[in-house]
Structures are given as C-alpha cells and as structure tokens.
C-alpha cells in the first residue's frame, strides 16, 4: 500500500545496491536492488513495486504491479502492512495471497502501536491469514533480519500452499465451479485468483485467457445467479465479502485502547482547542508586544 514505509523499507534492505529505470512501455519508475544482508550468501534481488491499494487494473501502477506478480513469478512477496491502519491494508493482502505466490507480511510501523494504544495478536492473525507475519519498523531498522530470514525461508519451500477459502459458502461454491472449468495451463495455486477474476468479469483476464464455450457459459451462469440474488454487480459482491472476512479477523486479533499522548501532543490539543486557541494566541501576542516594548524603552539612547 502507499504511505506504509515501502521506500524506507526498500532502502533499508538494499542500501546503495540499487538501480532505477522504467517498466517496459510505461513511465512508471522501476527500482531493483541487491539484498544487503549478512544473513544469506545468495544473491537476492529485491524489486520495489509501485504502491497500490488493490490488484484491480484501474491505474497504471496497479497494472504494472499485477503483471509483475502474475507473469514474472517472484519467489516471494513481502507485503508491507501499516500496523496502525491494518483493516484497510489487509484488503490488498487478501488479493496477494490468492495469486498463489508465497506472501510474507511485514507489519510495519509496529513501534507506533503502543503509543496509539493498539494491541495486535500477531500469532493468531498469522494463523487466520495462513501466512507468516513479522513485526518491523523500517525507519528504526527493527525486525529486518527476521523479515529477511522468513522471506528467504518461504522462497525456498519446495511446495506452495494453496490459498485458503475466505468467502461465504455461497461464493466459495461459485469459485469452485469456475476453477473446475479453467484450462489445464493454469497452475493449481493460481486457479483461485483467475476464478475470482473471471467471476468479476475482469477485462484484462478475460482478454488474456480464452475459455471454451462451455466454460464461458459456466462462468456467466454463476455470475448472473449471484448478481441477481444480491442485486449488485459481481465486483462489489466480492469486495463486500473481502471486507467481511477482514472485519471478522480484525475483531478477534486487534484491540484498540486509549491513545497515549506525548507532552507535545497534549500541548497541541490545548493550543488548537476551539475555545482556548484564540485566548492563548492573544496572550502570546501580548507577551511578545510587551517584551518588545519593554526592551525598547529600557535601551540607552
């Protein structure tokens, strides 16, 4: 996701061992670098993909990131999640897991959780999402060695775990039906992602993969049945299901307490108060005026 410390994390992992260019055919910046770590002797290339909110191809950045994940077959995805805004960030996570590429979540800005009164049961969250989660602070360099270890470990696994079911029984049934009619050229771990995208009538996927007449009819029948029942378009139905899943797991893994204020925060709240702000401002201006006037009167002529 944008604004979750992605660039800071990339710089921390690669240092000066990076080069910048453009993705083929577009003006979107491409950044790659060699992993800067004593933890592994292997040469590991880290690619900094454009920050995106979802895997739907609505922006150039989303198209670039999606094409890379699906076509370049990276060994592992490090998914940066803002620990202080976890519910919104997990939407992309659910989509990345469906691609069949192994995912390791970097729960970034974890150092800010205590200050904001947030507690996250990382172990349980990892179990519910079925992927490793490492708490990090890219800015402070915390948790990076653990993140590297886990990413390399996951990348070396010989077998790829199949994405788990996260939707309602009804929608999962439709996904299963579509998976069963996909071409044999689609690998087992990617079938779920393509099935969901065919149900959503994703134009890029429909154009890139031609289905047989019978398969296309199956997809259309499943889509129409769901849209008719819910009186909504398929993409909105899937989006709603994702957020229901996210809200369910967040409700059992994230506790939000009272935010702990620093001295600076407390002062800010007082001086920006709608009732106290103006009197405080007038008092400060009077003190400044008095100090300047007094100094002027006491200076020798």
Q: What kind of feature is each model-predicted range?
A:
Residues 68-72, 76-132:
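Conserved C-terminal guanine-recognition region of P-loop GTPase G domains, centered on the G4
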Residues 114-257:
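Alpha-helical transmembrane helix bundles of large polytopic membrane transport and channel proteins
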Residues 256-269:
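Cytosolic juxtamembrane amphipathic/interface segments immediately preceding
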Residues 270-274, 278:
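Loop-to-transmembrane-helix entry motif
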Residues 281-290:
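Hydrophobic core segments of alpha-helical transmembrane domains in multi-pass membrane transport
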Residues 295-301:
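Conserved small/polar residues in nucleotide/adenosyl-binding loops
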